Amino acid sequence: MKIGLLREGKYPPDKRVPFSPKQCESIISHFESVEICVQPSEIRCFKDSEYKEVGVAVLDDLSDCDIIMGVKEVPVSMLLENKVFYFFSHTIKQQPYNRNLLKIIIAKNIQLVDYETIIDEKGKRLIGFGRYAGIVGCYNSFLTFGKKTKIYNLTYAHLLDSMDALCKELEEVQLPNDLKIILTGCGRVSNGAKEVLDMLHIKEITKEEFISNNFYEPVYVQLNTLDYNKRIDGAISSKTDFYKSPNKYKSSLKDYINQAHILIAGHFYAEGSPYILTNDDLLSRSCKIQVIGDISCDIAGPIVSTIRPSTISEPIYGYNPMTSLEDDYTKKNIIAVMAVDNLPCSLPKDASVDFGDVFIKEILPDLINRGPIMSNASITLNGFLTDRFKYLSEYIN
């Protein structure tokens, strides 16, 4: 089996890669049947020379590879007929901007495996960059709080060269003793954010304590879906019921918002779910929110202040709940919003290594042995949508 690592072609350029040079070396040494080559790239976080040093061929032509792996969507001009491609296609939610990409993939008889579709027997996703989205997003939230309050001043994440440097930078954080933080979600993203909260030695408390008690040290609460979504009719709720009938629910986040200074949103938002945070919530006299770090970054979605994505180099903008418009985040009654939609790109080396480690451990053995995980992950096969993704037929037509 020959694996080719693509040069990222989408703009703006992405520095990440599925495997680092050391990981390629490890794969080749542990799996005799696997060969790896890599396309040359001037933007990749690892240099071409680093791959050459460990015996990986650097080639422009990947036409003799069995599997071609990238990170972001592959430009149509880089798609090779009758090949197997792995990348984040952003098509399974029927994103209109990638409809043509999927149509061409089918026309070229490409077998497409999207990393998002790789799941275990229980339906749980096995791989993604969510952990580093959470880590960088939480760091950026504290960077935003420092710039909003002028208590401290952190270096922008993309100017740091590693996770170690980010951890070192966190030593500069100085927080008020009465600070309360909400973290939504319980998946990879939110647990990545939790790593940063724990690095800062911020105390985790219960939901009841968060609402009812005063503290003399910074504290946070981690909320799952049913903590901030309740049945409209007051009936007992369950996750199964919520995902089946989200229209029967309403947000109860206001119970927590009136106690919080920072909201870090790391939840997954399903279409049809209730809005989590509204203008009315933010305009309440009881509202203390100063910073919203929306790691999930659903534009015009559940968090009313997320009116556009921000960028890695300019991660902060202000939101005025009185006008529903962008404003100067340094003003007193303006909420500082962090809503970067490509957070892992700030630490591309660490994010790539973390991704590769998971792929090697959880997925590669199944791929080599042609196991059930990978056979279930294909979106397209032999010029058609697979049974699992037949629902995309109307989307592409």
Model-identified regions with their sequence ranges:
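Adenosine-phosphate binding glycine-rich loop
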Residues: 113-169, 291, 296-397
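A structured beta-alpha segment of the ubiquitous adenosine-cofactor-binding alpha/beta core
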Residues: 50-64, 223-288, 340
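Phosphate/diphosphate ligand-binding glycine-rich loop within oxidoreductases
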Residues: 67-149
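An N-terminal-biased, well-structured beta-alpha scaffold segment characteristic
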Residues: 2-104
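ADP-ribose/adenylate-binding Rossmann-like module
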Residues: 81-116, 262-323
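Glycine-rich phosphate/diphosphate-binding loop of Rossmann-like nucleotide-binding domains
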Residues: 7-41, 153-259
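Short, ordered loop/turn segments at secondary-structure junctions
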Residues: 9, 40-43, 73, 117-120, ...
